[in-house]
């Protein structure tokens, strides 16, 4: 942004280069071994297969969907940065900072999740996201904005992949593909609704209301997790 004087068109043309190299690598450099088809392929998304999924799995789907409603697109972090009178070329650094914190915290929290209840870790992640939402809602300076962005990155490091692990632990091995497909379907719908709702709140009531709404949904998710049968919380 700084080198091209905020010329978005030039920046996107430069971004085409790694995208083209990735496609070339997939097309000409990656060779997959041929595996013989030993049985007839069938559609696994059937009512009888869904009935085989445990109640613990469906609890994870419900909790994950509600949680996703609070995790609207990170584009709203960029929009918040624009309101702080940050120079245009520096605004992408918000996403850089968030992803840097995320990458630095993902491994240690992933290691920690191996030795503690996944539901407990998810609850701690929700608390961090609540803190991030409140800081971002109240921020009026770039320093508090960065604090909120850092908290958002920490919550990503704590929770990203955690729900996937919970799906894997609660679904039978032969139906894990179906379980992940249904979970991703519900999460995708929730993310679409979350981002659309966040946009409406932003336009009608202001930026702060968007982040406050995210915090409220996190609280609802925590309440839902407290209502989860204790046997399911030990995954």
Briefly describe each language-model feature range.
Residues 1, 105-118, 202-203:
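Helix-to-loop junctions at the C-terminal end of transmembrane segments
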Residues 75-91:
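Short amphipathic helix-loop junctions that connect adjacent transmembrane helices
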Residues 32-63:
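Juxtamembrane intracellular "pre-TM" segments in multi-pass secondary transporters
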Residues 16-36, 221-229:
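C-terminal membrane-cytosol helix-exit motif in multi-pass small-molecule transporters
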Residues 1-10, 193-207:
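Transmembrane alpha-helix termini and helix-breaking/packing motifs in multi-pass membrane transporters
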Residues 5-7, 137-148:
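Helix-loop junctions at membrane interfaces in 12-TM secondary transporters
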Residues 158-171:
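Intracellular juxtamembrane helix-capping segments at the cytosolic ends
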Residues 16, 120-135, 212-215:
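Structural signature of the two symmetry-related core transmembrane helices
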């Amino acid at each position: 942004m700084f080198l091209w004087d905020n010329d978005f068109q030039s920046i996107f043309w430069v971004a085409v280069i790694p995208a083209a190299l990735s496609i070339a690598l997939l097309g000409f450099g990656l060779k997959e071994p041929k595996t013989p088809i030993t049985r007839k392929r069938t559609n696994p998304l059937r009512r009888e297969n869904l009935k085989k999924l445990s109640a613990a799995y469906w609890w994870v789907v419900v909790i994950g969907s509600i949680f996703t409603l609070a995790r609207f697109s990170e584009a709203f972090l960029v929009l918040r940065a624009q309101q702080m009178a940050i120079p245009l070329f520096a605004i992408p650094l918000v996403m850089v900072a968030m992803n840097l914190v995320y990458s630095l915290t993902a491994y240690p929290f992933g290691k920690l999740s191996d030795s503690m209840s996944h539901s407990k870790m998810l609850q701690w992640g929700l608390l961090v996201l609540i803190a991030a939402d409140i800081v971002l809602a109240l921020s009026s300076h770039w320093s508090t904005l960065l604090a909120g962005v850092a908290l958002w990155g920490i919550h990503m490091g704590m929770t990203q992949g955690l729900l996937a692990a919970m799906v894997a632990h609660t679904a039978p091995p032969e139906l894990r593909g179906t379980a992940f497909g249904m979970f991703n379907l519900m999460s995708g719908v929730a993310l679409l609704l979350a981002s659309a709702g966040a946009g409406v709140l932003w336009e009608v009531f202001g930026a702060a209301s968007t982040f406050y709404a995210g915090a409220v949904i996190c609280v609802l998710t925590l309440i839902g997790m407290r209502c989860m049968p204790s046997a399911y919380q030990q995954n």
